[in-house]
Amino acid sequence: MANYLAQFQTIKSSCDRIVVAVEDVSDLWLNVKESFEQRLPVKKACLNNKARNPVFVENLPAEFIQTTDSRLRSRFPQDQYLFWFREPYATVVLVSCEDLDEFKTILKPRLKLIVQNDEREWFIVFVSKAHPSNDQASKMAKRVYARLESDFNTKKRERCCKFDLHGPDAEFWDDFDSKMVDCIRNTLDRRVQFYEEEIRRLSEQRFTPIWNFCNFFILKESLAFMFEMTNLHEDSLREYDELELCYSESVNSPGKHREFGGLDTGDDQAALLNPGFKALTQIVQDDVFREFEFRQYIFACQAKLLFKLHRPIEVAARGYAFVVSFSKTLALQENGLPFCFREVWVITACMDLIKATTSHYDGTAVAIDSEREFCRIQGDLYSLCRIKFLRLAYLIGYGVEIEKSPVNSASLSMLPWPKPATWPSIPPDSSAETMAKEKMILQAKSREKIFNIHRKPLPLEPSLLLREANRRRAFLSVGNISELYDSGDGSGLDANSKPSPNKSASNYMARTMSGPATSETSLPVDRPMRLSEIHVAAEHALKQTVSDPNFMTSLSSLEEFEKRYMELTKGAADNYHHSWWKRHGVVLDGEIAALFFKHENYDLAAKSYEKVCALYSAEGWEELLADVLPDLAECQKILNDEAGYLTSCVKLLSLESGLFSSKERQAFQSEVVRLAHSEMKHPVPLDVSSLITFAGNPAPPLELCDGDPGTLSVAVWSAFPDDITLESLSLRLSASSSADEGLKAIKSSDARVLVPGRNIITFDIPPQKPGSYVLGALTGQIGKLSFRSHGFSQDGPVDTDEFMSFEKPTRPVLKVRKPRALVDITPAVSSALLMNELQWIGLIVKPIDYSLKDGILHIDAGAGLKIEESQMIEIETYGSDVEHVGGTDASKTSSSSTDTRKVEKVPIEDGKIKIPDWASDVTTLVWFPVRAIDDTIARGASPASPQKQSIVDGMRMIALKLEFGVFLNQVFERTIAVHFTNPFHVSTRVVDKCYDGTLLLQVILHSEVKATLHVKDIWLDLQSGFEHTGKGDGRPTSNLFPLVIAPSSRAGILFVIRLSALGDMDELEKADSMLNIKYGISGDRTTGAHSPVPVKPDDSEELVFKIAVKMKRPVLDPCVAVGFLPFSSDCLRVGQLVNMRWRVERLKNPEDASLLADEILYQVDANPQNWMVAGRKCGHVSLSNKQGSRIEITVTCVPLVSGYVHPPQLGLPHVGEANISCNPAGPHLVCVLPPTLSTSYCIPA
């Protein structure tokens, strides 16, 4: 079967669509050809895939070919099954007949003969030539078509359709397409089953000696190609995948040696996307194909199918994996391949994949995740191509011009040198090229970095090229040691170390006479190659390997190499930036920046370096950052970017101290200080969080009360290598419950010099709001620049630097308590003091865990109260603090003294008292004299005026304000009420009436104070209408003075009086009797009222108290009697009318002429909230002057509320109360019932 390989490839290249055979029985094809071909490709077809599942295929490619065509008739029967995929998938039989007899005798037998082949899928198209206007011909055509249907249609399948030549309808084309697709589907199913059986038969022979992979390949690819022709690309791809696996097993199986391939011209150019790169007959070897060409052929077929499936992302992914794996295969065959064949092939393969997948990729039709994945794979392809290209550049001598960056080191150190069987020898007549390479090596020197930074170069190769090349020379196993380790190429581990002058001669001799010098006959045939010669030899060998002149152009000069190197690096970086692996793109930006820097394009170099530094800083890769950051600083310095340059210098100082020497770090600091003190055009605040860090002391946090200032000590660490002077330093506190740093900065005005390491800085804390505070930020100024630090440090041992950390501390450094009572001031006396007398008022001042040192007490007396400032204020200890103060006072510790109470007299000025120092921490009692002023005359209680004086009248208010604290910032304010009262409350009553008209008047003295009262004398000045009996001096009948009245007790005194002649009634009503009491008081000021404070030394202790007493003449001879008549009803209800009746009777003729009138004025007084008066409230009634005359007054009222209420009262305004007798008296309260329930408002249940 392998002999058919050439024929198979020819058939496959010429067959790109399925064939539909046309059996033209009635010579109709030319008439219907155009109409039929317009139906191709089939717009929609339902086919079965390999798993027998229906698949809808769009635009199925097909071609109509007549059975008489040479393309079908020239095929041999023996290869019909082998290449069955090219045979027709359906047969369309075109017939036409206008006579039924002709159909029976001629057409029907011929059709029977055509369709008797069971392997052919067919259907009949009856072409009607009858014109629509010819009814007879149309009827005959219908009869013939009906007979055709009955002869060739079956119950399971209809095989006939009618085509009207003069105007086919749409239903015919639908029927035609349906029948054609059914035939194609059935044929495809049968052929798939055939190929599967043949493939299964051959697969069973895979481990037998007769196994032939070429036969298996032809069957497998025939099936795959048949799927591809029918647009079943998924099934075709699956067949190629299985074919690849089967080939891998076959080629890796032990057996005879097989050629690998790759030795033909042009094989260095990858053919991953060109399946027709070589004919299959060229790569076949016995029963299998050469691996180099066949693997690329299989991948090219897979890629072609994936592109048809619109899956360029999968092509890129598969392609990258194939290039990596096939590169390993090439490495195993490197001894038999041309020099650097693997590197060249990988570069061309990656570039072909990038171009093809990019051209087929439509980014608008994919999801964002798929787009990023595609860009990631493209970046990998670019990166792989870039590294291989970089390796070629090192081989031909351009390595000295390449930036020795960490990314290049990491990539190239894992990429071995080429391993040919024999390293290429230097061609003849190449001395000029050798000298040019030698000159390039000698003139190459590493770029000096800013600040004279010297860093050990990173290795870029797994081993020295010089040793590797000489080791692989066929006639020399190893060279002279000094020759093999020559580092003049700059690619060794000590690239920056220059050879000393005394070694130059020995090096020259080593190059001339390499090898051991034991004897003259032991010299080698040829000396080891120098590095320049290795570069020249590699370049000439590479030219023999590379077949693409454009590829070799990119290595022809250093400029062309850098151009191509920039394209590859930019391609990788740009794709990584649009993918998931953005960090890879940023790292490659550093390589782009190095080229920009080399060509003095500092602006673009700085932008790229900024991205790289930002990434390294965020990831914490300080060693990598230390390699790139100086380059950024140099670009910024050249561009005169002072702000950026300053920031870079600060970052360099922030890096780990071991990455730079002390001199280098001091150079960084000097640049920072120089810029800070210079006139910058655009000064920017510096973030020195990694250089200046701070933390609170390990001691407990500073605790302050609300409103108090304080002093906070903060430990500040400086990472500067030398002392640095700060023009100012400020600290911000942050509430631990909030991240807001809105608190005002606490400034330290002095210039601070921070030494390297730990510094203790103190800050004066102003009053803060209550809460817990942590360190927020440290700000300040270095020269003319402001800086800010958020670098928090954890507490740790003071003697070590292990406490340094950048974690925010949670331990607070300051706690401000919530507002609480720091002091309490309460009155020392709760009982009443004497009114209008100078009395001591005591205040208990109690500090609550807070010092009142230097405190000032403000006393503001309210209305009716006066402070006597001429008197000294007394301050004494109080309560349990007596012993404490006494024990600390040396003046009170004498053995003869048993009272340790400390008393001090201080003056009061403008209501201010200064608290003594000894009283700042103990509870004290402050006594100051006040006088409550009341100009009104006290009034006693009597039946005529029973009201008692209200306690509110004796209240006086004192406003207290205590300023204390360090800066008198704490204020305590309170207003206290002090009760003042008269010493006595007097009530009078007539206890008896004698026969001679005298009255016994009892005066009861009630003590109003908690002190003992000594009544020394008392007399009563009577009002008009009364007079004393006896001596008439107003004294009581008995002489019991001095009379002692205990606290809260009372005493009674009798006066004998009688009525006297009446004067004016108005004056009599207004006049009062005056009771005069001369008394003394003995009390303690700690209890309440006490003896008045003497203003002058000769002030008497006797006091006089006057009180007015209202006396009313008794009703001894009434003129009119008013009696309340009972209600007509026993019960009163709300809303019910009630008649109030009073009877008025004249008892005698009045002596007063004003009472002789016949009419009397009456007035009804009722509470409007309880009663509604329906009649007249006020009016005149006629009452005769004769004794015994009577009259009844009736007023109708309505009660408004239920309960016990006062009834209305009848009054006679023109008749005095002394002339009216109430008999019978009216009720004090009456009961009013609620109204009866009204059924009209009831709702039935």
Swiss-Prot record:
GO BP of this protein: early endosome to Golgi transport; intra-Golgi vesicle-mediated transport
Location relative to the cell: Golgi apparatus, trans-Golgi network; Early endosome
A Pfam family hit: TRAPPC10_1st
Compositionally biased tracts (Low complexity): 495-507, 888-898
Gene Ontology cellular component list: cytosol; early endosome; TRAPPII protein complex
Coiled coil ranges: none
Keyword flag Metal-binding: no
Annotated region described as Disordered, given as residue ranges: 488-524, 884-903
InterPro entries with a match to the protein in the record: TRAPP_II_complex_TRAPPC10_C, TRAPPC10/Trs130, TRAPPC10/Trs130_N
Domain of life assignment: Eukaryota
Protein name, UniProt field: Trafficking protein particle complex II-specific subunit 130 homolog
Protein's gene: TRS130
